[in-house]
């Protein structure tokens, strides 16, 4: 291999592949009549004794272990549902077939087998193989069988290998798939309609975040990957769809850590004639329902905590949370006192804070978030950082906005949605002014969205829930990379990012 060959190909395996082809063996056949999965075999023959079954089975899977004992071979194969043992005898297969398996089938190969089922003296349900077919010859070696794949970096970069070797990883992503399916079912049963809104957008909005930018050559136009589907879903409410949702891929050009990935999945839900109290209730109902369905209980273990999803959940205003965790009477303090308090406690961002609302958010983030382990709603946010939320009906300077925190992480964000077009125009103009002054996370002004509101949006409640973090909680994983099949990683190998390898792009 050349120095620029970054494949995992093993010379000995390549040699076996070539020898098989020289013998006329079809190494990569097109199909195999698999009639039984591993789990189906184990369930159907759970009561079998030592005699072979009369019924023939046909199954297939990846070879994990091969144990040779003279004229007999034991092997373990696995499919997406589990593993099962194979028993091969030279007297049954014939010398040619037996030697083919013995000499050329390795761990990592995929085989199809036909045979009968029996239980070994050790009590293991086993397929007594009458005939087999090599379906795929692997040319890359699997990790050592007793230790599996433990290197975290490799597990994330080569998820396919992680899934081959680690049942725990497969179970995590089965759970993720089930969580999303159950979420859809929950919303469908309550008459919400699912829609798809643009991922490429001429104007980004719906959240305060730095976007990814791209260029459409044919239109000669700058476009953005969406940071949220919010403004498009609200357009649908204006258009007459009263209950809508989208399970969306969002993209934010931000740091990567245990809770953040630049590409992530959220569900956003909007319902006409509802407010933020209704959306808090809906969020409780969704998450407690998912916990019960996935775990069989409303209690789950995460990061050393037993999290209780049973309803009702605790609710605190942001001012109440600051009073409890910062130990101050926020409403009674002057701006000067708030500034001095922030400097004294090294609160990040207080040097540039200019309003009471800015201090309130900074103090909550600094003192409060980390203590919110059990599901807790924080509500009544300052208007300064809530440009899409409706003004509070009775509290000056605040909005009807909430966030849900679990295990110190923000899990959901919802509002009584702002539907006053004049107010929305003024607030987005303020955001756009901040953006033009260098605030990279401030929102652009979207006049088409404002015009949509101008035609009339009914009172509406909305909420966005982070799917990735929810999966973390329900599977007990403390890193978002554990619940993303292909998390964003810095390019490690030249050519891995789509550039030509010889140019050296992506080298660390």
From Swiss-Prot:
Gene Ontology BP annotations: lysyl-tRNA aminoacylation
- Annotated residues that bind Mg(2+) 1 are located at 403, 410
Q: Which InterPro entries match?
A: Aa-tRNA-synt_II, aa-tRNA-synth_II, aa-tRNA-synth_II/BPL/LPL, Lys-tRNA-ligase_II, Lys-tRNA-ligase_II_N, Lys-tRNA-synth_II_C, NA-bd_OB-fold, NA-bd_OB_tRNA
Recorded catalytic activity of this chain's protein: tRNA(Lys) + L-lysine + ATP = L-lysyl-tRNA(Lys) + AMP + diphosphate
* Primary site of residence: cytoplasm
The note on cofactor binding and number reads: Binds 3 Mg(2+) ions per subunit.
One Pfam family name is tRNA-synt_2
Spell out the protein name for this chain: Lysine--tRNA ligase
List the top taxonomic levels of the source: Archaea, Methanobacteriati, Methanobacteriota, Stenosarchaea group, Methanomicrobia
Gene name tied to this protein: lysS
């Amino acid at each position: 291999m050349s120095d620029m060959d970054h494949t995992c190909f093993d010379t000995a395996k390549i040699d076996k592949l070539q020898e098989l082809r020289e013998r006329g063996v079809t190494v990569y056949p097109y199909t195999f009549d698999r009639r039984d999965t591993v789990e189906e075999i184990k369930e159907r023959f759970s009561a079998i004794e030592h005699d072979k079954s009369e019924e023939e089975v046909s199954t297939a899977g990846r070879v994990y272990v091969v144990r040779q004992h003279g004229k007999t071979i034991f092997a373990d194969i696995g499919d997406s549902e589990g593993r099962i043992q194979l028993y091969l005898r030279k007297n049954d297969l014939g010398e040619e077939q037996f030697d083919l398996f013995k000499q050329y089938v390795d761990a990592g190969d995929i085989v199809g087998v036909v045979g009968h089922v029996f239980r070994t003296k050790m009590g293991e349900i086993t397929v007594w193989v009458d005939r087999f077919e090599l379906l795929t010859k692997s040319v890359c070696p699997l990790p050592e069988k007793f230790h599996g794949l433990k290197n975290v970096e490799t597990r994330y970069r080569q998820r396919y290998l992680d899934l081959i070797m680690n049942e725990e990883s497969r179970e995590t992503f089965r759970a993720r798939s089930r969580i999303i399916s159950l979420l859809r079912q929950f919303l469908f049963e309550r008459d919400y309609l699912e829609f798809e809104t643009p991922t490429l957008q001429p104007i980004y909005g719906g959240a305060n975040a730095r976007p990814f930018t791209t260029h459409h050559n044919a239109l000669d136009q700058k476009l953005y990957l969406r940071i949220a589907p919010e403004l498009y879903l609200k357009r649908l409410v204006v258009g007459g769809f009263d209950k809508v949702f989208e399970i969306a891929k969002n993209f934010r050009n931000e740091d990567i850590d245990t809770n953040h990935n630049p590409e992530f999945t959220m569900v956003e839900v909007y319902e006409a004639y509802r407010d933020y109290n209704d959306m808090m209730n809906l969020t409780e109902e969704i998450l407690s329902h998912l916990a019960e369905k996935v775990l069989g209980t409303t209690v789950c273990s995460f990061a050393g905590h037993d999290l209780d999803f049973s309803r009702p959940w605790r609710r605190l205003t942001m001012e109440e949370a600051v009073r409890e965790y910062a130990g101050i009477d926020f409403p009674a303090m002057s701006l000067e006192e708030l500034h001095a308090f922030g400097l004294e406690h090294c609160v990040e961002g207080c040097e540039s804070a200019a309003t009471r609302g800015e201090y309130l958010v900074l103090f909550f983030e600094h003192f409060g978030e980390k203590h919110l382990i059990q599901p807790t709603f924080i509500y009544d946010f300052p208007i300064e950082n809530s440009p899409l939320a409706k003004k509070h009906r009775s509290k000056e300077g605040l909005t009807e906005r909430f966030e849900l925190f679990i295990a110190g992480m923000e899990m959901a964000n919802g509002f009584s949605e702002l539907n006053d077009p004049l107010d929305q125009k003024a607030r987005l103009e303020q955001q756009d002014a901040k953006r033009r002054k260098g605030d990279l996370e401030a929102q652009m002004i979207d006049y088409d969205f404002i015009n949509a509101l101008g035609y009339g949006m009914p009172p509406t409640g909305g909420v966005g829930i982070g799917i990735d973090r929810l999966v973390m909680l329900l599977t007990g994983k403390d890193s978002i990379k554990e619940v993303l099949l292909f998390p964003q990683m810095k390019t490690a190998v030249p050519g891995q990012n789509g550039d030509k390898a010889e140019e050296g792009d992506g080298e660390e």
